[in-house]
């Protein structure tokens, strides 16, 4: 008789343990589902914040490019003069024919006087415009 009770009690204990394991598995799966939902919400919020940040940065970059990218007619003229002066400076470096070398000293001094003064002024204006 005691043997029957021992078997019955152990059967009840085993079935109770099996039910508790089943409930634990269900609660874990429910917890996993809830965690997954909360992670999806967090990811959604994060992606929304990230896209808003990207939009803000793109807007700022576009605004800065428009603001600093605009050249007035005066700036354009200054740049044209600067380019012409640079071409003149480059022409000083080219070798000349022997017949032209006699007048080279005079011509070079004239070119340097004509170029260096305006170039310094243009560079000063350009730097002042960029920094100002």
Swiss-Prot record:
Give the gene name: BLP8-BH9
Keywords associated with the record: Amidation, Amphibian defense peptide, Antibiotic, Antimicrobial, Cleavage on pair of basic residues, Cytolysis, Fungicide, Hemolysis, Secreted, Signal
Mind telling me what this protein is named? Bombinin-like peptides
Report residue numbers covered by any propeptide.
Answer: 19-42, 72-112
Q: Where on the chain is Phenylalanine amide found, per UniProt? A: 68
Its GO CC terms are: extracellular region
Q: Which GO terms describe its biological process?
A: cytolysis in another organism; defense response to bacterium; defense response to fungus
Pfam families in UniProt:
Bombinin
Origin: domain of life = Eukaryota
């Amino acid at each position: 008789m005691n043997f029957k009770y021992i078997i019955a009690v152990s059967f009840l204990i085993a079935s109770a343990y099996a039910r508790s394991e089943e409930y634990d598995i269900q609660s874990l799966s429910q917890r996993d589902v809830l965690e997954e939902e909360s992670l999806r919400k967090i990811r959604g919020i994060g992606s929304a914040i990230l896209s808003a940040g990207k939009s803000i940065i793109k807007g700022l970059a576009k605004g800065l490019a428009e603001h600093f990218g605009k050249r007035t007619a005066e700036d354009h003229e200054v740049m044209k003069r600067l380019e012409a002066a640079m071409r003149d400076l480059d022409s000083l470096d080219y070798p000349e024919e022997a017949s032209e070398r006699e007048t080279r000293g005079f011509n070079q001094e004239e070119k340097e006087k004509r170029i260096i003064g305006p170039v310094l002024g243009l560079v000063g204006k350009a730097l002042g415009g960029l920094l100002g």
